[in-house]
């Protein structure tokens, strides 16, 4: 019963953390953004992301924002996913060290540190690229990025912490699922599940089906666990933290009025000009 309650609770907790992270990013650019707006935008975009390789469909989050310049939100989505990658790299250090050795674990840690530092170097790199780029189309895109107000370091670190927390919830949920099939040491969760989550960044299949299950079966097999158990744990986590949020997003899509609000504001402006 305890395992069942923790698994059920993990779904709204995971969704709330994801929406809170998105709200922090939105509020850093559009101060009038609310948590409910961020929640609706995240869930609707997530439902499209699930059916596209590499979750590219999550860029559709901006379609559910009631702002005329909502296209600027694409940069925020990229930053959101970038923070996820950094958090995963740090979380995967223990597993990489366990399976591949200290040197590879250190390289993964170093990669995470470099990726985090690039956030602070990005404005300077952008200025350099804008001055030296000879391709007009790319230069125009770079100039467009320069117009977007930079995210301050406080927001970046808070988003990074929430990203890390989301993955901790996923790892804890996976471990709870594993315990429902039998006993397993905590070290199993700390070494295996961050690595299986890291496969989500590979844009190979829709929903990453097959890749994640294969990685879970192989890694848990190193601890002598049966393939059937590993497969069921992977599929159940996919249902809890992917299918259910995507279904919720699909349900609320018809009731999302963001696009209509944008159109209404444009019509009001035209009427005022007339």
Describe the residue ranges of each PLM region.
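Predominantly cytoplasmic-facing regulatory/coupling regions of multi-pass membrane proteins
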Residues: 1-43, 97-201, 233-235, 239-274
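Hydrophobic alpha-helical transmembrane segments of ABC transporter permease domains
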Residues: 78-100
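Extended non-transmembrane interhelical loops and adjacent amphipathic helices
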Residues: 39-67
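Membrane-interface alpha-helices at helix entry/exit sites of multi-pass transporters
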Residues: 35-37, 69-82, 226-236
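Membrane-embedded alpha-helical core segments of multi-pass
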Residues: 17-18, 52, 56, 87-95, ...
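Interfacial segments of multi-pass membrane proteins
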Residues: 64-71, 192, 214-229
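Transmembrane alpha-helix interface/packing and boundary motifs in multi-pass membrane proteins
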Residues: 47-53, 194-213
């Amino acid at each position: 019963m305890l395992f069942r309650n923790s698994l059920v609770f993990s779904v709204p907790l995971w969704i709330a953390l994801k929406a809170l992270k998105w709200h922090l990013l939105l509020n850093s650019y559009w101060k009038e953004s609310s948590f409910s707006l961020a929640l609706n935008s995240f869930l609707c975009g997530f439902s499209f992301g699930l059916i596209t390789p590499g979750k590219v469909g999550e860029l559709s989050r901006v379609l559910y924002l009631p702002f005329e310049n909502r296209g600027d939100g694409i940069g925020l989505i990229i930053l959101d996913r970038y923070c996820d990658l950094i958090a995963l790299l740090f979380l995967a250090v223990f597993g990489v060290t366990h399976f591949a050795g200290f040197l590879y674990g250190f390289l993964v840690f170093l990669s995470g540190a470099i990726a985090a530092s690039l956030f602070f170097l990005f404005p300077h790199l952008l200025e350099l690229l804008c001055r030296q780029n000879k391709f007009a189309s790319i230069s125009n895109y770079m100039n467009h990025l320069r117009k977007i107000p930079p995210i301050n370091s406080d927001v970046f670190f808070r988003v990074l912490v929430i990203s890390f927390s989301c993955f901790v919830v996923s790892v804890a949920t996976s471990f709870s699922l594993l315990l429902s099939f039998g006993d397993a040491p905590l070290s199993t969760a700390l070494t295996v599940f961050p690595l299986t989550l890291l496969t989500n960044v590979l844009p190979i299949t829709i929903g990453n089906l097959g890749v994640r299950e294969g990685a879970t079966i192989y890694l848990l097999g190193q601890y002598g666990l049966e393939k059937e158990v590993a497969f069921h744990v992977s599929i159940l986590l996919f249902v809890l933290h992917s299918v259910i949020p995507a279904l919720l997003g699909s349900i609320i899509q018809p009731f999302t009025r963001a696009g209509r609000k944008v159109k209404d504001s444009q019509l009001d402006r035209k009427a005022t000009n007339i």
